[in-house]
Amino acid sequence: MQKWASHLCAPQVPLSLWIRSSGPPILLGLYCGFAATLPTGPFHVPSVRASVSGREGVSGRSVASSSVTGQPVIIPSAYSPHFHVVSVKPHAVTSSAPPCISLYWYRHRVGIEAPRTAEPRAVTAIGWAYAAVASRDTEVWVRRSTLLDIIILPLPHHVPVLSPALARLVRLFVLRHSNQFLLVISSLRGWSGGSIPLEYLATPLVVPKIDPTDDGPSEPPVEPPAEASTTHRVPGTIVTALRLLCLGRAPLPVLFRETRHEPQRSSGGGDQEDFSWLNAWPASAFDYQKGVRPFRYVTDGYNPGSSVKKELSQYHFCTVVGPRKQTLSLSSPPGLSIPDDNSDKSVNLSLLPTTHKEPPPCREWIRTGGRKESDSNNDSMNRTEAPREGYSLVKVVDSNNGLYDHGESVPAEIHDPSISNGSRGRIVGFRSTRLSTRRKSGRRTASNSFRNSPGAPVEEGRNTGNHHREHPLLFVDATRRNSYSSLVTRVLRTHDMIRLLCIIIEHKQTFRWILNVVNDLLSVGSSDNSDDAYAADGANDAATGGGDDTDDDADDDANAAGYIRSMKVRNVEYAVNERTGNLRVLKRPVLQPDYRRNLIAGLMRARRRKTLVWESLQSRTHSPLFLRMIGNSAPPQFSPGINAKAILTPHRSAAEEEDNKAKPVFRRSAKMATAKRIAAAKRWDFTTAHLTRGCSPIAQLYLRRNVILPTLTIFRNICYLIMFQKGEWGEDWNELNKEVYVGRSYDGNAAEVAKGLPRRWYRNGLQIKIVNPFYLKHRRHFVYGQSEPDDGTGINSTGTRNGMSKSISSYETNSYGNSSSAGGGMGFGHSTVLGCLAESPLGDRIKRPSFWKPLLMELGRVWWGNVPWIRKTHIENLPSRPAGKDPSPVGKADGLDAGTGKSIGDRVAGTRPGECGAHSAKVGGGISDLSIEFMPERDCPLAVSDQSEYRARMSTGELGCLVARGNDGASRVTGEFAGAGKAIAPFGPTGQDRGYTGGSGTAAPILIHRIVVRARGRCLRLLRVSTCFVQIPFSGFHGAAAPICRFLPVWFNIRLITRSTRRYVSKVRRARDLLAGRGGGDSIGVYSSRRDVRVISQAYVLSRAWRLSAVNKFRPADPEYGRGNPGARKSTAHLGVGGQGILGKRPLRALGGRYEWARDPRRYNVPSGIWCRIAPRGRKMKDEYPRMKDRELNKKQSMTLDEAICLRGIDPEPAAGVERSRKIDRQYGSNPPSKSSPDVVPDSSEIRGFAKPWRMGRGIIPNDRTRKHRERIVSGGGWDRPENRMNERKNLPFGSNIHSWLYIDIPERFHILEMPEFVATRYLGLACELNVSTASGYVCAGRGSARARVETEFREDRIEGRWDLGSKQVTVRARKMRDATNVPHAVFIGSNIEYPREGSVESTCESMSRDMAPPPYHAAPPDSTNGMLDGNRGHRATGVDKRFLKHKMLSVLPNFQNRFRGILDFIAYYEKSVPPRTGILEDGGDKTICPHSSHIGDVPLPKRRAGSRILESFYLAEGRSRGARSEGGTVEGHERRDEEPPVQNRNAEENETQTINSILRPGHRPEDPSRMNRPRFCTNNGSQFAAARVRIYPSAGIFMT
């Protein structure tokens, strides 16, 4: 009896108060009504049939009395646990049901025969026989027999009535409802499914067939309803009853009674605790899976030395994750719901008593946590079904319960593949999985707060053990208190020991002091100290790391103690808090988890059953790879308050490092990425997918080992033999044999592939790790001494800064993750699905320098010198041009360096400013000296160490050189031969070896070369592709637009043609130009076939090339990148015979002249073919054909926007605000261009000197930081007439250098959301796609056409139009813009922020919408309309010129659709010393978070914003002294130098690094955020200016600090 009674010990099902009070009476009434008014079973059949037949003797009173008499038997059997157990248990029902049915049948059979003997003519049926008997004694006997039938038969009857098989179907549809409500449906289904079938099945049994030969009354007898033999009916009835009894077992309603927290003492007064299983409803009795679950034998009572153990079903246990390990814990009752948002829902706080007898700490805890009602859940969903259902993780909210100690706690993330995601989330005994301590790490009293509380009852004369047994919950964590029985509480005490061990490890320095407290805690209630010693030794081993006992010893100790087996604390790492210095313990995943550690010490039968259950659960759990993919907790080094450098982590595998990568910064992007990752993981988390994915690395492994590597080795050594060198067979085979292949599953199991794969690799996922991977490398240094083919950039990828050759093997030394550079180190890699090597299983592919390229170069060099016909073929056909060092160079200059050698001051070793280097070139086999002027600051970029940076800069150099020498036309070379003076070449070789070998030197092959060049150009023109911005023929920009080709075949053909002919054509052009220059005499200028060149800014060309090339993905790490940019070439084109060129000799670059040089727009002579493709539309319309030879007159070669205004025939007058412009100009001259800010010009009506139509139309011209005194050319008569010139006043608020580059057709509509997205804000020509064909026609048409086009543009875009800022349309669109950009508007502040101050903060977009109006009129703060432009208080203009509004909006809202998605930088917890970055916006009761620094400058710039980076590269090319004046400087430069104070120069010099950092790295935040980190808008004349900062203007509110 004790065995099956122990199964009934279950926690109480928590119910609401109204259910507990009103549920049982209502349900009892329903049940009584069913039993009293409806036919409830076959015992009513005789009475009903007698009443219907109308026979005398049996009236309605008999039927009513029989129903009422049966209720006292039915009700106790349904509501009394004792009767219920006897009736429901299968063994009891099986033994009681057949005798009852047999006795019923036999008694009626005997009762029928007896009346037949006395009265032969009487009807021998049950009811009819009673009615036909006239004797008084016979009637009494019949009534007594009927009463006896009613009493006996209802005992087993209520089982099929209440819960038949149909009731199971109801539970599938009615989920998460109260078990009491489910009873009502079960009763209805039970009556219809159990009572009616039994009635009709029992009717033929109890009413046998009457023999017609018997004598009877004169009336005809009533035929029985069925014809069947009695022997066939009895077994059928018994089988039907047995089936219904076994199918229906559902919990019944019961009036719950709250149990006291104090254990109930037995009547004998002994120390053992009574089993209080009758206090709670025995829900475990209906566990339909209990047959497959093992039993746990746990100690009954609090005496650890007691040998009395009781059997508890496995139903009450589940696997949970604690702070340190997985352990068995009591599962929640079947009625509890799965925790979703807070683990407090799994604790029934409402059942805790709140009387004054409870200790004060308990009441305080109840008030803090709050009373939260638990949700009900379907009891069919238990713990063993959780892995199969795939529940999500529990989101524990620690900020509400105070466990998250303001950034000092570290989340302990455990990746253990032993259990699934759903089981991990079902934590019952813990409110949080985080380890949290107080701020101070000093000694604290580790005692329970309830032990010494004033209200804790302590009886005198009792020892400590009795006190602990009397009040067991005083030693359990308060967060784990629930209305469990005392036995449950005893099992939960195991968690306290585990948590205490975690605290011991955190504070090693106080271990000896805490150990005494542990011993005192473990010695509670026991005089035997064997368990204390065991626990103390285990804690000591866990804390000191010395617990290395075997599992057998641990099992013996656990069996002796009767506890849950404890896991040794290992595989931990430590993290140190930077602020407090506290030590944190982090649990790392156990590679090979042992299922036995979760077993209760007991019989081997339990272990065997546990193994079977574990294996069955493992087949339904998620794979370890899935658990890794869905893990989204940030690593501890990214937690608040934790210093990443202070984390002491041991060696980790590559797979573990992959899990600790940083997560996205913005919350929205992080959630989206997590959702996609989890969806993909769930979609591919099945055995077939893992098997397929695992087979691919295995196939790649064998293919690599047996096919690929041997083939490459053989081919490599054959190449060595062809080069007449010794092969390296032995070395290659030895290294190949050193490769070791290790198969690893994602749960940590590893095995060598040669010996077998890991267990269950097809389920857990497989990855192949290659130890000592073999790769082809050069063991000789003959290849590295040679220079690479000339690419026209002067870049030497193998040289160092000291001029020495560098071996490529330095790149290959650390090709793999952990390879050692000291030699002999063990490298490793991971094979991917496609057979490539990666640094980690899910990491990036390992990239190494090319092995075959230098080998083929060496092969060509060797055969070049040995076979004569190879040389001839190479001259004419080979694409590459290998050449050796010049044996007798006349002069050398340091080439473009790409090495990593060290140099003093991190400068490039080269010639000093003003020096010229001499180079030699071989033409036709001879040596000709050609002196080339060479500027190291422009021609030599800084050295880089990364190959990707090297290639990126090489692409930039190629584009710059291409612009310098034209598209497919000949480069212009003006030179003098050696001994005759110096010559200037457009692009000279700068490396040590730039000789050109071969070539006959005659004019005969030139014609053939021209044919080849033309054919190549025609082929490339047929393969044009459209890029994002303009259509570019790939005759020149092959490397720029190849990454963005639309079709792979086109891309392949273009690369094939360009690579095969690029070197060849380049060599032919150089040779032709040199030959032409030699025969022309002294200082002969060579005309170009294309004379329609345009002078453009180098800043614009470089930024344009940067944007169109692969460099858009490259961000230079060094701000001094561009000090020697190869694109910064000096113009050398000549327009006539003789002279020095358009710009003449460029002055020496002094230390202070870099800003003038950066702003100088004349840098390149670009042919119109290229100019039509890269120039903006507005610029192309205003440029003129450069016919001026004089440098001073050349300044007036372009028609600007100002001149276009003057062309309308109105002489401008002096403008107002000149003094203000002078001050700004002085400030601009004393600071770098990147620090300057735009100024807004007042209304044009107040400016004197503008055209009258502009005044009438109230047109406002955007301001642009003009230079001092400029001369303008006006229309009328001729361009050179003095009367058509006018001298403007100094510092007018408009100029020519900027507007000529900013002109654009701006959309007429005020609809920001539909405007094109800007790639670079101030390059406004990119706002609309350019029409190359139309633009090229403008340029080629000449000056008159360009002038007419300007006037046409002004007519089309009338400036007289005005926008009414108070209109409803503007208001609606501005509100739409605000909603689209105001990310903080959607953030809701919870109620957990204490003491919020009332106030409002203007949002980002509201400030921007107000800033679009002219600043002189927006002094008034926004009104209650939340900053909308729908009111006029007299301080803001209701109308504004649309041209100015367009310009202003483009200045304030650059590409806002992409930049205002993640402005919010919310820091929830901060110290008082650090001001908060967030504020509270409260408008009409709504609270939102708005950052104080929410302006455009804080938003990271897009990747393609390369213009500012390029312009900043020009700044540091000069020295630090800005006072020095360059040769040929202007008078304005003298004045500006004299006016600027030296203090400003020093300040600008000190802040130069921060300024450049803010541009190169937008996330950089210097000390002064008001001046730094602002968006720079670069202009094409080399200058920059920042947009007006969008600040937050408080509107009658106070910021929260």
Curated annotation (Swiss-Prot):
Coiled coil: none annotated. It is a multi-pass membrane protein. The chain crosses the membrane at residues 25-45, 68-88, 147-167, 181-201. Residues 209-231, 351-388, 411-470, 535-558, 787-806, 879-916, 1216-1244, 1521-1574 are annotated as: Disordered. One of its GO terms (biological process) is protein transport. Residues 794-806 have a biased composition (Polar residues). Residues 548-558 have a biased composition (Acidic residues). Residues 355-375 have a biased composition (Basic and acidic residues). Keywords: Chloroplast, Membrane, Plastid, Plastid inner membrane, Protein transport, Transmembrane, Transmembrane helix, Transport. This is Protein TIC 214.
